A protein has these predicted regions:
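Short loop/turn motifs that connect adjacent beta-strands in outer-membrane beta-barrel proteins
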Residues: 29-37, 84, 125-134, 176-177, ...
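Detector for outer-membrane/organellar transmembrane beta-barrel domains
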Residues: 37-39, 45-49, 157-249
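Residues on the lipid-exposed face of transmembrane beta-strands in outer-membrane beta-barrel proteins
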Residues: 43-45, 75-79, 89, 117-121, ...
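Transmembrane beta-strands of outer-membrane beta-barrel pores
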Residues: 45-51, 91-97, 123, 141-147, ...
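Surface-exposed strand-loop-strand hairpins of Gram-negative outer-membrane beta-barrel proteins
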Residues: 47-72, 154-156
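Outer membrane beta-barrel transmembrane domains
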Residues: 54-56, 63, 205-310
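Residues that define the transmembrane beta-barrel architecture of outer-membrane proteins
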Residues: 69-73, 110-117, 133, 160-164, ...
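Outer-membrane pore/translocation modules
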Residues: 99-207, 254-258
């Protein structure tokens, strides 16, 4: 087996899934807040694939399993607890598989991944020169919903450990609809249990428990609202950098202890219908341009959103 970037399964999807707030989208990474008692349900479909991966920093071609593919369906809801405090909940279902050249075959995996909860609060929202400056903070927690095997790389549907996230967000939006946004997050991860009692991580460990490396998450966006705030277009960058971990050893499978880093660039579009009111649609595409111990993956996604009052 070759490495599969399961670590970003939640990140990429949660970045781009959204709710609607008076024709505006909301994610854990943006600067938009829903009003109190407003809710929005979103359903996202995402497909990703790769046939190359980084073994450490060396780029290899998948030989035995060729192209690794992942499909995900994720329901999500965003709730306006207060005007300045929102709750977001997501529960993705993931299926992985690969093509099988040379007569080889490896079974994929499927199931619900992690239950993810996030609270987003608005700290500052004020006029500054000809635009608006917004500062926000997000705290999140995710935990496995099922007893999936995290050490089955590249097919594992997740890294199998609890995660706490702490994120700061800053956005400056101009009057004509252009905006720039940046976000920085620290992702603190726990341990996952493997179905073996020995592994190597820069040394021998005689235990089934593996430390999943914590990581820093970077996000930068440039976007614009068009058509009377009914169409939003964005170009974005996403980066992940683990704070510890080991490299994949030559011709060995990846494991949850690996030090994963990657840089992705992408585009997205979101459109909100005037009638029926509260309905929106989204699409996005992203590509991994650099990485370490991860697949050189591309992905696209589509989704629908519906806003309603509680």
């Amino acid at each position: 087996m070759k490495n599969r970037n399961t670590i970003f399964t939640f990140f990429i999807s949660f970045i781009l899934c959204l709710g609607i707030n008076i024709s505006h989208a909301q994610t854990p990474f943006d600067a938009i807040m829903m009003n109190q008692r407003e809710s929005c349900l979103a359903v996202i479909y995402e497909h990703s694939w790769f046939d190359e991966y980084w073994e450490g920093t060396y780029l290899r071609t998948n030989g035995t399993i060729e192209t690794v593919k992942r499909d995900m369906v994720m329901p999500m809801i965003a709730i306006g607890v207060f005007d300045q405090l929102n709750l977001l909940v997501a529960a993705p279902y993931v299926k992985t598989e690969s093509t099988e050249p040379n007569g080889g075959y490896f079974a994929g995996a499927k199931g619900f991944q992690d239950l993810s909860l996030a609270l987003k609060g608005q700290i500052i929202n004020k006029q500054l020169n000809s635009g608006t400056l917004s500062l926000l903070a997000t705290v999140g927690f995710s935990t496995p919903m099922t007893n999936y095997l995290s050490d089955y790389r590249p097919y594992s549907i997740g890294f199998g450990a609890n995660e706490f996230s702490f994120r700061g967000i800053a956005q400056y939006k101009m009057e004509k609809g252009f905006y720039v946004r940046g976000a920085l997050a620290y992702l603190h991860r726990g341990q996952t249990e493997a179905e073996r009692d020995y592994y190597y991580n820069n040394g021998s460990y005689y235990t089934a428990w593996m430390d999943v490396p914590s990581a820093w998450n970077y996000n930068a966006v440039a976007g614009v609202w068009l058509l009377n705030n009914s169409l939003k277009l964005e170009a974005n960058y996403l980066g992940i950098k683990s704070t510890s971990g080991d490299d994949i050893r030559p011709y060995n499978a990846a494991q949850p202890t690996n030090k994963v880093s990657f840089d992705q660039v992408g585009i997205s579009a979101q459109y909100y219908l005037n009638k029926p009111q509260g309905i929106g649609a989204l699409s996005y595409f992203s590509h991994t341009i650099n990485g370490r111990n991860t697949g050189k993956a591309s992905m696209f996604g589509v989704g629908l959103t519906y806003q309603f009052k509680i």
